[in-house]
Amino acid sequence: VGNGNVAMDIARILFSTPSSLHATDIAGHALDSLAQSRLKEIVILGRRGAECAAFNYPELAELGDLPDTAISVTGSDINSLPISADRETQLKLETLAKLCREKSQGSRKIDFRFNAAPIEFHGEGKLERVRIADTQQGRSQEITLNAGLAFAAIGYRGLAINGLPFNEGQGIIPNLGSRIIENNAVIPGAYVCGWIRRGPKGIIDSNKKCA
């Protein structure tokens, strides 16, 4: 649930071959579980259209390297969307359309479902089904998908820290160029970086540079 970079990373890891992950710092028990996985389809839900997708280009493009994996789009005709004035958005739309064309076949599948939101989760002792509503049509148009696993990847919100100012509306620590401010005055020796500085934007590399 959600189509940001966390959702892209989850999909990529779940469909990566164990051999491709051996050189990483992934935990051994996680690697063993992936080796035994019988997962065949991943559905990525986004409540808005493709033009509003939260993932970044690099994370989306990496899905193209997954072997034997088809990629599709449901709920948004990405080929008929108007050209976006935002260069990054247009690049993402073009890349997603290209992935759908070039990776239309595979024994496994990643389906991007746009304008879709979960409304109910069902199962006896474990997840078995998810009811999904079309966010444009409302509950008048619902479907039920069989599912055995669900991840919530719907964003991040900062938490207040005792002794420091906090902007409740934005979920960040107010700052001026990373220097924490209170009542428009800089607090000496107090700095902030990353998502708590500017909100949940950017990938790991951009936050490392911020730090």
Predicted regions and their residues:
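Short conserved micro-motifs at the rims of enzyme active sites and ligand-binding pockets
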Residues: 54-56, 124, 162-163, 202-205
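FAD-site-proximal beta/loop scaffold in flavoenzymes
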Residues: 121, 126, 138-198
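Extended, hydrophobic alpha-helical segments in both membrane/secreted and soluble proteins
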Residues: 6-10, 147, 151, 211
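Internal hydrophobic alpha-helix adjacent to the cofactor/substrate pocket in enzyme cavities
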Residues: 12, 16-20, 69, 184-193, ...
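Dinucleotide-binding/catalytic capping subdomain of oxidoreductase cores
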Residues: 8-135
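Short, conserved micro-motifs enriched in small and acidic residues
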Residues: 5, 201-208
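Eukaryotic short linear interaction motifs
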Residues: 8, 52, 159-161, 200
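Glycine-rich adenosine-cofactor-binding loop
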Residues: 1-15, 195-197
